[in-house]
């Protein structure tokens, strides 16, 4: 008869699996392999990177209002004495602040330079600049890598005149410059549709007169030339005549016909503007996304 022997389990040395199939203590607490260390290192670095990005995004503020890249933020921003004097023209009560709206691409990093599209809307139907930003320009502008900006009063103006639009827009631009150091050097283009295409004729030279680097004016459905008058009144300097001007005209536009818009182009040429381009599209009195994309890319190309 075979003699029974006790099962021997050894600890403290590399004995390999025991006769019971249970690993030894050294196997159970074996040192991690190089692969495990690399995986752990990658996970740690990933967590640090994510935390850094999240912290940077959370620290972004526009006019003291926190926001994340890829979002649209609205902030109440102060008016300078000059902006208050403009706002008061036409008998308007001066508001305590302006309402500035900023839309940024998902990869927005304020330490880099960004082109800024400043929006001018018509005053018809009580539209505000921020309305046109959201309805007509935001999707294409962000996809093309632009920051979009609009300035309005906190309420509708009693007399929604050019001076009012200039003051509120400049307040938004000032807020941009205060929020992001170095942004005073960012290139700016101005866009206006219908009545906004007329108003932009004053807002663009006004911004240039006040030190902004204006690289383009984009007009859609404008049947009158106000840019020549804006240039004469505001006197931003002869260099402003080199600003690229892009006209977008719908074939079926009955409010601003192609004939009228080509006539406006002729007037602007006679004023002395040198870089003028007109694009047409199948459509009526509307902002065309493809034309917006062409205009923005043209401005950036010429600004290089």
Whereabouts are the PLM-identified features?
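A domain-start/cap signature at the N-terminus of enzymes
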Residues: 53-114, 206, 263-266, 276, ...
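Short, low-complexity intrinsically disordered segments enriched in A/P/G/S/L with frequent Arg
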Residues: 4, 10, 15-20, 27-36
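Active-site machinery of serine-nucleophile hydrolases
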Residues: 116, 120-172
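Gly/Ser-rich "nucleophile elbow"/oxyanion-hole loop immediately N-terminal to the catalytic nucleophile
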Residues: 106-113, 158-195, 208
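Catalytic active-site module of serine/aspartate enzymes centered on a nucleophile-bearing elbow/loop
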Residues: 292-304
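Primarily recognizes the serine-hydrolase "nucleophile elbow" in alpha/beta-hydrolase
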Residues: 186-239
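Bacterial N-terminal signal peptides
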Residues: 38-50
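The feature captures the conserved acid-bearing segment of alpha/beta-hydrolase catalytic domains
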Residues: 216, 221-292
């Amino acid at each position: 008869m075979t003699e029974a022997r006790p099962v021997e389990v050894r600890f403290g040395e590399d004995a390999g699996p025991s006769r019971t199939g249970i690993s030894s203590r050294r196997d159970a607490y074996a040192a991690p392999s190089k692969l495990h260390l690399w995986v752990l290192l990658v996970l740690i670095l990933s967590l640090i990177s994510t935390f850094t990005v999240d912290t940077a995004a959370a620290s972004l503020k526009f006019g003291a209002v926190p926001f994340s890249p890829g979002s649209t933020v609205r902030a109440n921003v102060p008016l300078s004495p000059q902006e208050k004097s403009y706002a008061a023209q036409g008998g308007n009560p001066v508001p305590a602040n302006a309402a500035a709206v900023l839309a940024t691409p998902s990869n927005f990093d304020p330490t880099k330079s960004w082109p800024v599209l400043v929006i001018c809307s018509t005053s018809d139907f009580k539209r505000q600049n921020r309305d046109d930003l959201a309805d007509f320009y935001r999707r294409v502008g962000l996809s093309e890598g632009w920051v979009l900006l609009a300035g309005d009063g906190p309420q509708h103006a009693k007399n929604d005149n050019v001076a009012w639009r200039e003051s509120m827009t400049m307040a938004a631009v000032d807020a941009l410059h205060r929020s992001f150091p170095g942004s005073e050097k960012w290139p700016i283009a101005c866009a206006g549709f219908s009545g906004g295409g007329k108003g932009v004729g004053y807002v663009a030279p006004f911004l240039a007169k006040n030190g902004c680097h204006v690289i383009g004016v984009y007009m859609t459905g404008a049947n009158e030339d106000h840019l020549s008058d804006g240039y004469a009144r505001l006197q931003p300097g002869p260099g402003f005549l080199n600003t690229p001007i892009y006209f977008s005209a719908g074939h079926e536009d009955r409010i601003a016909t192609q004939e009228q818009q080509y006539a406006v182009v002729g007037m602007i040429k006679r004023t002395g503007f040198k870089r003028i381009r007109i694009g047409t599209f199948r459509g009526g009195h509307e902002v065309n996304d493809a034309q917006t994309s062409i205009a923005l890319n043209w401005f950036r190309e010429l600004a290089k």
